[in-house]
């Protein structure tokens, strides 16, 4: 890490999924300076990482959408009751653009350390790129932000390809002529 100046914000949000995007919008509306630190190269959280074939929400799409703005509700039309991953990702990108939130998101900036100093009532946050100081640190990382990699005896000796839903490759996968095992 370069020896740079500590950047100060009223609030730091870790994660640019649905919760992080909402927090950034609300904090800005309160007049607070805030930034999202996002380890991925785009927003979406779960809906960015989980792009495996057939990924979709398990509740009605309308319930998944933000309820804080009636105009937003009226301008977005879900194509099906239980939307697939690409449409959900398109929706959250629409929200970020509509409310001009992208300038408050630092992409490819994974938090490596967050320390609260009680005597100062401040958080000190470090990433591979920057150091930050803030009064409020909101962890909007969600319960699916860390892949659950199985640990089987002999797995380290397996020479084939291992794919997980939580880290599914962006490019299309071809399983023709391959032996495939599905676990879980």
Regions found by a protein language model. Give the residues of each.
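Glycine-rich active-site loop/strand segments that organize a redox cofactor
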Residues: 33, 48-91
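Glycine-rich dinucleotide-binding loop and its adjacent helix/turn
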Residues: 71-78, 84-88, 141-184
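Conserved Rossmann-like nucleotide-cofactor binding loop
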Residues: 19, 41-42
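Nucleotide donor/acceptor-binding cores
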Residues: 9, 32, 135, 177-179
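N-terminal Rossmann-like FAD-binding beta1-loop-alpha1 element of flavoenzymes
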Residues: 6-36
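Extreme N-terminal leader/targeting segments of oxidoreductases
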Residues: 1-11, 29-30, 58, 90, ...
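A short beta-to-alpha transition loop/helix N-cap that caps and shapes the active-site region
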Residues: 43-48, 146
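Feature captures the FAD/FMN-dependent oxidoreductase FAD-binding
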Residues: 78-145
